[in-house]
Amino acid sequence: MRLHWSNAPCICYRISFLDIVLNESNLESLREEIDQIDSEIVKLLNLRVSKACDIGKIKQLKGVDPYDPAREEQVFTKLSSYSDGPLRKGSLRAVYREIISASIALEKDIVIGFLGPEATYTHQAAVKNFGSGLEYMALPDIPDVFSAVESGHCDYGVVPIENSTEGAVNRSLDLLVDSELTIIAQVFLRVRHCLFSQSSLDAISEVRSKDQALAQCADWLRVKLPGVSLVPVSSTAEAVRECKIHKGVAAIAGELAGQIYEVPMIESGIQDRSDNVTRFLVVAKQALPMRSETSYRTSLVLSLKDEVGALQNALKPFSERGINLCKIESRPSKRKSWDYFFFVDFAGHPEEEIVGDALKELGNACAFSRLLGSYPETGN
């Protein structure tokens, strides 16, 4: 056997037994410090929850619900200003989301309805907004969410309203027109679609999902699965449940749905755009009081008079006062042919003087107008 010697320099690391002992000692010392810190954190958390429950009792006497999204936004903003790192602001927000959720759960039994089944994007948005400490009710369709809140079976409902690539969720818009519910919060959720199936990619003949999800993956489907049948169903999670029992069927949904229903993931990140975000609304029976330190967005619906310049006249009260219109969208009213509702979002709250004046003038310029709700601009 020949031995070959290299001229390359050799770097040797010498770790003595003493070094190992010192490192182990330091490790144990750090763990003891963390244990002590955890002990203090738990004491402070219980103290915080006790104070929150005291506030809850005062709210109960006043007939005010413990959930207050505007106040929560103030808390999250203050927390961000307190922290210099290394904890990220998003992580800090997530931690306190659960702390606040646990506090609310001790103050009152609250039920949140959402478009089910479990693991839909709407479910994820609801948990992002309310935390995991509250009770959730999965409902089969968007109208059922509205009905559950209207009947009192749920305290709040979470529904999708628009997507950054596919636009409005028309079912939600239509229901907002006739419902007495009001919007009290908004939630933004980044959407990452995955393909699930019990079959291999080349054996798939049908893809099921929510209609919006199918549209958001149209380019990928056209290239990777040309000619397959695209079948819309009530939700992304329902599609995963169905593909589990049907051979040759695939589903488009979020990663969580595949994990919960135990269906293999074939492809991930199949949405046509990486910046795919869905906006959700939280609806309730009663509006929440305005907080002066909070920036608000307000939603309303209107229909125009049948006259020249009707739309310009309707929007004039906002432009004259420098009120920013965040969104305007038309939708057939379904009351008569070629009659449209216009859904408008603007920056501000009706209790602000200039907004109140604009709304009074708007009422005279329109055939019909109704406020749908005011809510914190920031949102989750």
What are these regions (language model features)?
Residues 10-12:
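Cysteine-centered motifs
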